[in-house]
UniProtKB/Swiss-Prot annotation:
It comes from Comamonas testosteroni. Its EC number is 1.-.-.-. This is 1-carboxy-3-chloro-3,4-dihydroxycyclo hexa-1,5-diene dehydrogenase. The keyword Cell membrane does not apply. SUPFAM superfamilies: Glyceraldehyde-3-phosphate dehydrogenase-like, C-terminal domain (SSF55347), NAD(P)-binding Rossmann-fold domains (SSF51735). The gene is cbaC.
Length: 397
């Protein structure tokens, strides 16, 4: 797969190990507004082309797939440019910040006959796929209830101003619920019919959502409760064996150091400037990547309650507590991080298997994120997406 990268920011930096280790992938082009990032890309990939804008990148005949890792508010326009140029698109979550944007993106994909896949999301993770396989086997009866929780330091990592502005896709709902709700939807296998939510906005200096809790009901009778906090107090990696979200083993750390580090940054200057200093082409390159994690990625503690068992996926194993019996299946080390994303993209393009994480799928996840932000008005669930639905219903061929 010949990939052109649009946006050389943090999302790209997290995907870079995947691109480098997947033999099916060739990075052939990049575009960004930062000349230092483009210079670093050219140094890391001498045979690749660099472009000052997405329009010129999409005219490059070597580009087969466009990976979009730009800020959330630009996802829609960048995806439309790429799709209209006849490129397949892999766009980071959230797909966009409005349902109308999602609608236009899906319509472009259908007209172009190209695939629009949204990821990385933690619903791609192997432990989640394995849990779904156990559910689908019917061995433990139907899913009845799902519990998901994650306590992190998300809100106190250095941020640009837009990342603390909900209207521009900032805050933990657009950034983190888009992971958590994707996982819940994949496992529940129903359509959401009711949501009750509570939002936490507890820091006047960071005036966006830092936490949420919600009860979600599906049309097949499944109920799920989800809780997330990014306020950098309790670290729920404790219940994941001190394996962090990226699958890296961490020292036992009862308290996050993130708030203290942010105070140090703010005392010296701008957190946006500090974050920029750690970006690709400044603090990062393809030759200075950390060692590969030895576990699968995860998104916190998850319990799937079926009629005959509780299923608990973790980063290194999956546990089943079934009517007095305990089963444990250890996972082998992943070949490379986020392999599942590239497998789905490759299988779609090659015609091997239709994708799961299409634009339509991601649009429904965004609909649920918006429901959380609006307080879960039950009469709106599923109706917003219908009201702005595209004439076409397929994200690609």
């Amino acid at each position: 797969m010949r990939i052109g990268v649009v946006g050389l920011g943090k999302a790209f930096m997290l995907m870079l190990p995947t691109f480098l280790m997947d033999r099916r992938v060739q990075l052939v082009a990049a575009s960004d507004t930062d000349p230092l990032s483009l210079r670093q890309f050219k140094a890391d990939f001498p045979a690749a082309a660099v472009h000052g804008d997405i329009e010129s990148l999409c005219k490059n005949p070597d580009v087969e797939v466009v990976y979009i890792g730009t800020p959330h508010q630009f996802h829609a326009v960048h995806a439309e440019i790429a799709l209209n140029a006849g490129k397949h698109v892999l766009v980071e979550k959230p797909m966009a910040v409005t349902l109308e944007d999602c609608c236009r993106m899906n319509a472009c994909a259908q007209r172009a006959g190209k695939y629009l896949i949204v990821g990385h999301s933690h619903s791609f993770d192997h432990p989640i796929s394995r849990a779904k396989e156990l559910i689908d086997s019917g061995r433990y009866g139907r899913v009845r209830f799902i519990h998901s929780m994650n306590y992190t330091d998300f809100l106190y990592r250095p941020r640009r101003a837009e990342e603390l502005n909900t209207d521009l896709g900032g805050g933990v709902v657009f950034n983190q619920a888009s992971h958590q709700l994707d996982v819940i939807r994949l496992l529940a296998q129903g359509r959401v019919v009711d949501v009750s939510s509570y939002l936490g906005r507890w820091d006047a200096a960071r005036r966006t959502e830092g936490a949420y809790s919600a009860l979600i009901k599906f049309d097949n009778g499944v109920a799920a409760n989800v809780t997330y906090s990014g306020y950098a107090h309790y670290n729920s990696d404790e219940v994941m064996g001190w394996v962090n979200e990226l699958g890296e083993k961490q020292p036992e750390r009862r308290l996050f150091p993130t708030r203290l580090r942010l105070d140090e940054v703010l005392n010296k200057g701008s957190e946006a400037a500090y974050k920029n200093e750690m970006s690709y082409g400044r603090g990062w390159s393809a030759h200075g990547l950390p060692k590969m994690a030895r576990n699968h990625q995860h998104f916190g503690h998850l319990v799937i309650s079926c009629e005959g068992a509780d299923i608990v996926p973790k980063a290194e194993k999956i546990e089943v507590f079934a009517n007095g019996e305990y089963h444990c299946e250890n996972f082998s080390m992943p070949d490379f991080p986020r392999q599942e994303v590239m497998d789905e993209l490759f299988d779609a393009i090659s015609g091997t298997r239709p994708p799961v994480h299409t634009g339509e799928w991601a649009m429904e996840t965004l609909d649920l994120c918006i429901a959380l932000l609006e307080g879960g008005k039950p009469e709106l669930i599923g109706m917003r997406a219908t009201a702005v639905a595209c004439a076409g219903r397929s994200s690609g061929r």
